[in-house]
Amino acid sequence: MNLIIDIGNSVAKLAIFDKGELVEVFRGSNHSLDCLPMLCSRYPLKRGIIASVITLSNTIRHQLERLPFNIIELSHETPVPVTNLYKTPQTLGMDRLAAVVAANWLKPGHDVLVIDAGTCVTYDFIDADGAYHGGNISPGMRMRFKALNIFTDKLPKVSAKGEVPMYGQSTETAIRAGVIRGMEFEMSGYITHLQKNYPELLVFLTGGDEFSFDTKLKSIIFADRFLVLKGLNRILSYNDKL
């Protein structure tokens, strides 16, 4: 069995895979992986991989050192089963790389746009030949709500929950619709633009806010909350065969 660890800006996700199948997912602090001893006792783990968008804490490094098996710390030097065309691979978020690896593995031979709606929203494109072309980063939903409140004098902090009209008729609904509809139109714009050159484009939607948009977008969307974890497992399996 494989141990997959994805440390994000907000939380850490730990997953167990058995022969390519996702068995269980755990969520916890991104500063300490206290559930590791429990996972090691519960599952016959043989190998692992970790990807992090933040600097690993000393606590986590010590916890990883005590694991009874080898664990790969994913970096731009780790072999991956796609061609990475990013000009500064050392600055590329490993979660973004893992997501396109998963998309290419799940839908081989297809042009794919991966939208990851988390702390930030990332748009990453991998073509049918498995070449990753790069992508863009924009503010995530919570970041947008927070920015409107912090960087203005009178705009209130608004919850994402509530009415989302096409045109806000109060400051609260104007902010909520501005953020959520704005993200919806942003996503649709990227999809429409890519479809001009890649008419058979497929779209994967993942991240903490993915299910806010999977039914709003008109294109065929594959919503997969665990896309990054699947990509990390694919990378681990690929390296195990080298």
Swiss-Prot record:
Residues in a coiled coil are none
Q: Which domain of life is it from?
A: Bacteria
Known EC number: 2.7.1.33
The reply to whether Repeat figures as a keyword in the UniProt entry is no
Its needed co-factors are: NH4(+); K(+)
Q: Which keywords accompany this UniProt record? A: ATP-binding, Coenzyme A biosynthesis, Cytoplasm, Kinase, Metal-binding, Nucleotide-binding, Potassium, Transferase
Q: In which pathway does it act?
A: Cofactor biosynthesis; coenzyme A biosynthesis; CoA from (R)-pantothenate: step 1/5
Detail which positions bind substrate. Answer: Y86, G93, M94, D95, R96, T171
Catalytic machinery residues:
D95
A molecular-function term among this protein's GO annotations: pantothenate kinase activity
Q: Name one Pfam family in it.
A: Pan_kinase
Q: How is the cofactor bound?
A: A monovalent cation. Ammonium or potassium.
One Gene Ontology BP term is: coenzyme A biosynthetic process
Q: What is its main location?
A: cytoplasm
Catalytic activity as recorded in UniProt: (R)-pantothenate + ATP = (R)-4'-phosphopantothenate + ADP + H(+)
Gene Ontology terms: cellular component: cytoplasm
Q: How does it assemble?
A: Homodimer.
Function (record text): Catalyzes the phosphorylation of pantothenate (Pan), the first step in CoA biosynthesis.
Q: Which PANTHER family match?
A: TYPE III PANTOTHENATE KINASE
**Name the record gives this protein:** Type III pantothenate kinase
